[in-house]
From Swiss-Prot:
DNA binds at H93, R111, R156. It holds the Pfam family Fapy_DNA_glyco. Its EC number is 3.2.2.23, 4.2.99.18. This is Formamidopyrimidine-DNA glycosylase. It comes from Burkholderia vietnamiensis (strain G4 / LMG 22486). GO terms for biological process: base-excision repair. Keywords: DNA damage, DNA repair, DNA-binding, Glycosidase, Hydrolase, Lyase, Metal-binding, Multifunctional enzyme, Zinc, Zinc-finger.
Length: 275
């Protein structure tokens, strides 16, 4: 599933082509994704200028004067920028095209767990949308601190890794990035969230930011389907310290990396470096 780095890579790739351009038309070939595509989406966006492209968690927010269209990539979704001249014929899993003057923004999603929604301006600020209102803080915002993590986890017995994945404290820290952040912070993923000290949470907050920044710089992680807006795969996963390295020697101390299952997801850690 595309996580925050993959969505941010997509946003950065799309924004220079989209911002300040008008949507000439929208072709919706699949009306049902995770939720129904708004029946009036094409009408709402026709001839509208895209004012900005933002990201909130794993959601992309495209602002026009009348509101915002919201895109979630789901498990296998991608957004590609394709030149109008010679654009490929839409294939089976190419569900929606936004056509601009010189290019097409194409949404592809083989498993159809993604979503395209419309939030009219008269409904209020897009960040109050039900899908966005309860999200945790952004990891690159000043609000994301070790003190926040420490305060929000007091008395919680859930593991620190599962607390990171929940998304109610901080958004976008998916499975691969949780494992890598905990490795960098030296925290064992099975530790109860409520038992992690403030200094260790401060290290974890720094590790989360550093891990996500590195992933964005490397184009995200391509574990199965993800490609950026230019069709290129990410390569963060090639340099992981822990994730998907079960049985291999730790890059720091040489101890074999262990793999366990937490909440039906694989977790990887070094039993020596992480305490």
């Amino acid at each position: 599933m595309p996580e925050l780095p993959e969505v941010e890579v997509t946003r950065r790739g799309i924004a220079p082509f989209v911002a300040g351009r008008r949507v000439e038309r929208v072709d919706v070939r699949t009306a049902m994704l995770r939720w129904p595509v708004p029946a009036d989406l094409a009408e709402q966006l026709r001839a509208r200028e895209v004012l900005a492209v933002e990201r909130r968690g794993k959601y992309l927010l495209f602002e026009v004067d009348a509101g915002w269209f919201i895109v979630h990539l789901g498990m296998t979704g991608t957004l590609r920028v394709l030149p109008v001249a010679g654009v490929p014929v839409a294939a089976k899993h190419d569900h929606i095209d936004w056509i601009f003057d010189e290019f097409v923004l194409r949404f592809r999603d083989p498993r159809r767990f993604g979503a395209v929604l419309w939030h009219p301006r008269e409904a209020g600020d897009v960040h109050a949308h039900p899908l966005l209102a309860s999200l945790g803080v952004e990891p690159f915002s000043p609000a994301f601190t070790g003190a926040l993590l420490h305060a929000r986890t007091r008395g919680r017995t859930v593991s620190v890794k599962q607390a990171l994945l929940a998304g109610d404290m901080v958004v976008g820290v998916g499975n691969i990035y949780a494992s890598e952040s905990l490795f960098r912070a030296g925290i064992r993923p099975t530790t109860a969230a409520g038992k992690v000290s403030l200094p260790r949470y401060e290290r974890l907050a720094d590790a989360v930011r550093a891990t996500l920044a590195d992933a964005i710089e490397r184009g995200g992680s391509t574990l199965r389907d993800f490609v950026g807006s230019n069709g290129e795969s990410g390569y963060f996963q090639l340099d992981c310290f822990a994730y998907d390295r079960a049985g291999l020697p730790c890059r720091v101390c040489g101890t074999p990396i262990r793999q366990i299952v937490q909440g039906q997801r694989s977790t990887y850690f070094c039993p020596t470096c992480q305490r």
